[in-house]
C-alpha cells in the first residue's frame, strides 16, 4: 500500500503547493533494533526526492543508509534541488503512477514511481527543453534493493522505462 499511497499524493496533497512529507528511505531499519520492511524499490525511494515537493528537502533515513549508496544515486541526492522554477506532470494517474519533471535553473530532474505491485512499463514524453539531450536514468535493478542505470540518447522525447513492482526511476538532464 505504501507505493499506491505515494502515487496518490502528487495528485492530492501535493497538487497545488508544498507538503510535509519525509520520503527517500533506503534501509529497513527505523532505529537501532527496530526494523520495518520497505515495500518499494530503492529507485522508487530515490524518485520521491523529485515527485514530492515540500519546500525543503528532508530525507527520513539514517546517515548510514545514504553513505552506503552507490555513487550515482548518492550524487543525485547531493544535486537534487529543494526549490523549483518549473514543475510539470509528464504522465500519471492517482494511485497508479506518477512521472514528474522539475526544473531548477537550466537543470531538469525527472522522477517516476509506480503504485502497483506488478512489473510494468511506463511511457512518457520529456519536456521540450530536454528533447535531444543524452543522460542516464537511475532505474530499478534486479530486485527491490538494487539500482540499475539506463543511458538515454533521446531523439524525439519519448521515453519507455521498465519497472519492478512498486518501482521507480530518477534522472538529471542538463
Walk through the language-model features, giving the residues of each.
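Glycan-recognition surfaces
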Residues: 1-64, 92
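Conserved, mostly hydrophobic/aromatic
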Residues: 51, 110, 166
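A glycine-rich phosphate-binding loop feature that marks nucleotide/adenosyl-phosphate handling sites
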Residues: 64-73
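Edge strands and adjacent loops of beta-rich recognition modules
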Residues: 73-102
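Carbohydrate-binding surface patches
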Residues: 93-130, 169-170
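A common structural junction motif
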Residues: 128-133, 141
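Solvent-exposed beta-strand/loop surfaces of large extracellular or lumenal domains
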Residues: 137-156
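C-terminal beta-strand-rich structural cap/linker in extracellular carbohydrate-active enzymes
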Residues: 151-174
